[in-house]
Swiss-Prot record:
InterPro entries in alphabetical order: Papain-like_cys_pep_sf, Peptidase_C58_Yopt
Disulfide bonds: none
Name of the protein: Putative cysteine protease YopT-like blr2140
Keyword rRNA-binding in record: no
Keyword annotations of the record: Hydrolase, Protease, Thiol protease
UniProt function note: Potential cysteine protease, which may play a central role after invasion of host cell.
Class of enzymatic activity (EC top level): hydrolase
Gene source species: Bradyrhizobium diazoefficiens (strain JCM 10833 / BCRC 13528 / IAM 13628 / NBRC 14792 / USDA 110)
SUPFAM superfamilies for this protein: Cysteine proteinases
Active-site annotation: C100, H213, D228
Pfam families the UniProt entry points to: Peptidase_C58 (PF03543)
Amino acid composition bias (Polar residues), ranges on this chain: 7-29
Length: 271
């Protein structure tokens, strides 16, 4: 079992990721709307395969990482730095081989540690990073076996993912909730769930181009931290507009410079 997130900081196969300016109004309204759909499996999601690593951005090196004790309180202004204004812990080159499911599992296992310790543990060359790679390989093998037996891509993905999460000592909920990114509905239902104090969620990001990527969130003591294996940790207040703003900035980053358009998010609670 994992613990509540430590420190002061406040599924799917995988592809490339992304930035663009975001308005400073109510993001809960302008994000309009991750229309919730229950994961009925009637519509198959893309298979999670490939390399979910971000394309390098020459400006990334100049982006300041925020203090872990000071989550962002204002909307990002610069297209190049909008996402990184939220960053409270940096992680580089950990996901170049597309092992985001394994890295996310290991991140959950290390929640009781400080942000810097969590990122150090996931650095390439570490034992934890090697373990993440092994979990990813197991996930892929299980998924391939299930597909060969006739399972649909979504069913195979969820079952394989749950298996490796459980073997990592985690307790994933059996089902996922599906949200269509950009459709008119109520984004608050998703961000309120993510922001619930003491909750941990695995989020699968699906892109219109067919790729997918796995990230995670943990909410504790009035702040919510989002972990993206490509970039590190991002932290905001556990406020609907703040969380919606962070998600929009993440979507912007995957669109530019990576050319990936976020279309669907699934959420799975870690019990």
């Amino acid at each position: 079992m994992y613990d509540r997130i430590g420190g002061s900081s406040t599924r799917t196969s995988q592809t490339d990721e992304p930035s663009q300016s975001v308005d400073s109004g109510s993001f809960t309204e302008t994000l309009a709307d991750l229309a919730p759909q229950w994961s009925s499996r009637s519509g198959e999601l893309p298979d999670k395969m490939g390399a979910c690593c971000s394309k390098p951005d020459t400006l990334d090196a100049n982006v300041q990482t925020s203090s872990a004790s000071e989550p962002s309180t204002s909307s990002p202004e610069s297209p190049a730095t909008s996402l990184f204004e939220y960053r409270t812990a940096d992680l580089r080159d950990a996901n170049v081989d597309g092992i985001c499911v394994g890295l996310t599992a290991e991140w959950f296992r290390n929640l009781s540690n400080s942000p810097s310790t969590r990122m150090s543990a996931l650095t390439p060359g570490s034992q934890t990073h090697a373990s993440a790679a092994e979990r990813q390989q197991q996930y892929q093998r299980l998924k391939d076996q299930l597909r060969s037996r006739g399972a649909g891509s979504s069913q195979a993905d969820l079952q394989a993912q749950n298996t490796i999460l459980e073997e990592a000592g985690l307790e994933p909920a059996g089902e996922e909730k599906r949200f269509a990114f950009g459709k008119s509905s109520n984004v608050k239902s998703m961000v309120n769930e993510i922001n619930e104090d003491g909750s941990n969620h695995l989020l699968s990001l699906y892109f219109a181009e067919g790729g997918a990527h796995t990230v995670a969130t943990s909410a504790s003591n009035g702040t919510t931290t989002l972990f993206d294996p490509n970039y590190g940790e991002f932290t905001v207040r556990s406020d609907p507009d703040q969380m919606a703003s962070l998600l929009q900035s993440l979507a912007n980053r995957y669109r530019n410079p990576n050319g990936q358009h976020l279309s669907t998010i699934t959420t799975q609670r870690m019990q």
